[in-house]
Swiss-Prot record:
Tissues expressing the protein: In the kidney, expressed in glomeruli, predominantly in podocyte foot precesses, as well as in proximal tubules and collecting ducts (at protein level).
Predominant location category: mitochondrion
Membrane topology classification: Single-pass membrane protein
Compartment(s) where it occurs, according to its Swiss-Prot or TrEMBL record: Mitochondrion membrane; Cytoplasm, Cytosol; Cell membrane
Residue stretches spanning the membrane: 93-109
Protein name, as recorded: Atypical kinase COQ8B, mitochondrial
Keyword terms, alphabetized: ATP-binding, Cell membrane, Cytoplasm, Kinase, Membrane, Mitochondrion, Nucleotide-binding, Transferase, Transmembrane, Transmembrane helix
Stretches assigned to the Protein kinase domain: 187-419
Sequence motif AAAS motif, residues: 212-215
Length: 528
């Protein structure tokens, strides 16, 4: 757990996919725009034999003018390519098998080259498996199969190079920035299976090329018949059924070829990851979570949640109101005051989610937070990884944070045992390292004035503790903490990247008193 948290604090979370917006097929004249009016030729009507009323020229003009007034939209990565998703387990296994053979042949060629007079590895001391050719094989395979395998690759991209080799980190950084999208026929098949053959009756138009492609699905821009712009997320076929096998195949392959560090993916963390991926593949669950957050944040002055489009929601298709804005990592050019406000609100949201709602969207991807400068609000996206927290967990967890904020090391140790982080039989080296890690993370809540997130060395200090924490841990941490600490680390990282100065102590103290007031009881004493 501390390994994941420390690594998260060292680098950025992966974007959903952005850079150069690809023009629609109609604009490129590769083939007709397949449904609805072409975005770049809006007055043109194609497929007029399809059922449903198309937009009038006046409606198109008004929609275009409204779109120009709205905030920027995410854009597809220029590295993304149209590529069929292997939908069956056999075809996905074949992809991993082909990768294993390719890595072996590539490594053999590299070793052979080294054995020749004057030969050497591409990088001195590097693994023969991690040649440029093999790196490209890994990237291409993960971007082809997508699903759980690509998700793990994106997770590994944010590990610090003290945990995985710089070579492997560079490989997974390329994976993080790339995600291919499925071809038209495969996407059409999913839409027809989920929404029926008459799904076109539900929309006025839907763009053929997605504006985002990620590990589980891709997102298309569409327009309802009333002119409402929507984002339609379509899941890749086969990814939900292949979660466990994909995880096992990829990790076995990587451990065999490039040697992932011991403890990076412990058994319990793998089980938790597989459960989270299963949640993310259930779009009906995600729609329900989005609606829950929309109610919880209905009166919030800073955050908004797009409306769910019920008629476009199934297990593998999710329609929501289209949102505009820029991801958090693109807010660095804003004024110090605006950056402080954004980060303050982000931390306030995290504390509300955990200690007021006890329901949190745990994906720290910066593309899930879109800042709209015109309204000075942030739109929240992607609720697939949302989860609830029980009161027993939050009762103890808030006391751990409170002890760290108060600088009480003994109470941090005791409350960590109450939380079942520790058994009480750990070595002194482990207990000291655990307490020190908690105290480091509690520093923003202990500072009497504004805390300068950009000036701290939080990540480096925690990284130094990780070897001890891995070597001497007697029990896995509570399963709730895997996702929780990813989210908190992502929030701290955003504050550091934006060089925010925030008075965190008052924010937490207010949260603490409100929490116990809502529980109508006194803070829990330490267990004897």
């Amino acid at each position: 757990m501390w390994l994941e948290l420390g690594a998260m604090l060292r680098t950025t979370c992966g974007p959903l996919g952005r850079a150069v917006r690809l023009p629609c097929a109609g604009a490129l004249r590769l083939r007709p725009h397949w449904w609805g009016p072409c975005r770049d030729c809006l007055a043109q009507r194609v497929h007029q034999d399809q059922p449903g009323r198309g937009l009038t020229e006046d409606e198109i003009r008004r929609a275009r003018e409204a779109r120009l007034r709205k905030a920027p939209r995410p854009q597809l990565s220029d590295r993304s390519r149209e590529r069929k998703v292997p939908a069956s387990r056999i075809s996905r296994l074949a992809s991993f098998g082909g990768l294993a053979v390719g890595l072996g042949l590539g490594a053999l060629a590299e070793v052979t080259k080294k054995s020749l007079p004057g030969g050497s590895l591409q990088h001195e001391g590097s693994s023969p498996f991690l040649t440029e050719a093999n790196a490209e094989r890994i990237v291409q395979t993960l971007c082809t199969v997508r699903g759980a395998a690509l998700k793990i690759g994106q997770m590994l991209s944010i590990q610090d190079n003290s945990l995985i080799s710089p070579q492997l980190q560079r490989v997974f950084e390329r994976v993080r920035q790339s995600a291919d999208f499925m071809p038209r026929w495969q996407m059409m098949k999913v839409l027809e299976e989920e929404l029926g053959k008459d799904w076109q009756d539900k929309v006025a138009s839907l763009e053929e090329v997605p504006f985002a492609a990620a590990s589980i699905g891709q997102v298309h821009q569409g327009v309802l018949k009333d002119g409402t712009e929507v984002a339609v997320k379509i899941q890749y076929p086969g990814v939900a059924e292949s979660i466990q096998s994909d995880v096992q195949n990829l990790l076995a392959l990587l451990k065999m070829s490039v040697g992932l560090p011991e403890g990076l993916f412990a058994e319990q963390s793998l089980q938790t990851l597989q459960q989270e991926l299963a949640w993310e593949c259930d779009y009906r669950r995600e729609a329900a979570c989005a609606q829950t957050f929309k109610k919880l944040l209905a009166d919030d002055p800073f955050f908004r949640v797009p409306a769910v489009v019920e008629e476009l929601c199934t297990t593998r298709v999710l329609g929501m109101e289209l949102a505009g804005g820029i991801p958090l990592d693109q807010c660095q050019g804003l004024s110090q005051d605006i950056r402080n406000q954004i980060c303050f609100q982000l931390l306030r949201l995290c504390l509300r989610e955990l200690f007021e709602f006890r329901f949190m969207q745990t994906d720290p991807n910066w593309a899930n937070f879109l800042y709209d400068a015109s309204s000075h609000k942030v739109t929240l996206l992607d609720f697939g990884a949302s989860r609830a927290f029980g009161t027993e967990f939050t009762d103890h967890y808030i006391e751990v944070v409170k002890a760290a904020a108060d600088g009480d090391r003994d109470r941090v140790l005791q409350k960590s045992q109450d939380l079942k982080f520790l058994t009480g039989f750990e070595t002194k080296a482990f207990s000291d390292a655990h307490v020190e890690a908690v105290m480091i993370l509690g520093e923003p809540f202990a500072a009497s004035g504004s805390y300068d997130f950009g000036a701290g060395e939080t990540a480096r200090r925690i990284q130094g503790l990780i070897p001890v924490l891995l070597r001497h841990r007697l029990r896995p941490p509570p399963e709730e903490t895997y996702a929780l600490h990813r989210k908190l680390a992502g929030a701290f990282l955003a504050c550091a990247r934006l060089h925010a100065h925030i008075a965190c102590r008052d924010l937490f103290q207010d949260t603490y008193h409100r929490y116990w007031a809502s529980r109508q009881t006194l803070p829990l004493p330490a267990a004897s």
